Amino acid sequence: LDLPEIKPEIAAVRDAANRIRQELAKVIVGQKDVIDQILVALLCEGHVLLEGVPGIAKTLIARAIALVISADFARIQFTPDLMPSDIVGTNVFDLSTGKFNLRKGPIFTGLLLADEINRTPPKTQAALLEAMQERCVTIDGESHALDPIFTVLATQNPIEYEGTYPLPEAQLDRFMLKIVVPYPAYETEVEVLSRYNSGFRSVRLDEAGVRSAISKDELLELRRAVSGVLVEQPVIEYIAKIVRRTRENRSLILGASPRASIWLLLGSKAVAAMNGREFVIPDDVKLLAAPVLRHRLILRPEAEIEGITPDRVVESTLAEVEVPRQ
């Protein structure tokens, strides 16, 4: 069986994704789906919300990915007393020159880990979310552009935790994906312990031999390649039907917006390219439906009491919408 030659730019996306996975495997055990979904967001200029309990390697994943894609890395620990200026920076008066100089905040970076974003008041959350949307920040009326690969990985604890400020729907909608980071499987946890027993420490990534797999410029090229992936009309209609079906669901106060449809389309193109394909198939769409939709579906209180979850709504929606024939 002669498979048709794939375009070099699509092969480049697939090969880069494999190199990135190989480097990350040196420090991260398991979590394949989490890593692949973060890669999808990076290829689509999307931001990611990671949800999971403390201590399941969310910070390690973020730091390792920054190293592997040659991005500058910064981390902000969100707290109730954090101010917007702590994120974006501030103009400081220099007595020797008599001028104001910009002291840049941690947001001027490539990959930003916004840790426990739901522990800080709405005003500070809004400062970060404006930067995510515009890819620039305004300080004292002056606009400053951010790094072209600026990407936010925000973490939040599951909402039951005390002392949290849940993100409003409009702000949740700014995140391309919400990835639920699970507890590791038994075999994975044993492997993690074995590595630590042999002297591995998560703060010393270079000692684990993690190297950069792609340059910043390569990432920008890969993004261009992904945008060229083909999506046939039936698949476009399939995406629209899935998202529209959530708006009719009786368990929801709020279904997904057209922004969700756009992210589902763009993300499916990245999944196809990472698999070495020049065209999107319905399985690419299904793979991303939950991470794209779960944070955009707002349940009615009575549905929550019945134990219905956003993921279950996504599952039933996919079961109801007819899949286009290939």
For each predicted feature, which ranges?
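C-terminal engagement/docking regions of AAA+ P-loop ATPases
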Residues: 1-7, 11, 18, 246-326
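Walker A/P-loop
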Residues: 3, 42-79
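Pre-Walker A (pre-P-loop) alpha-helix and adjacent loop at the N terminus of AAA/AAA+ ATPase modules
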Residues: 9-56, 244
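Conserved alpha-helical scaffold flanking the Walker A/P-loop in AAA+ ATPase domains
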Residues: 37-40, 93-113, 142
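Conserved beta-strand position immediately N-terminal to the Walker
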Residues: 48, 112, 150
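Walker B catalytic acidic pair
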Residues: 52, 115-116, 127
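P-loop (Walker A) phosphate-binding loop of NTP-binding proteins
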Residues: 53, 87, 155
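Canonical AAA+ ATPase core
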Residues: 94-99, 120, 132-229, 269-274
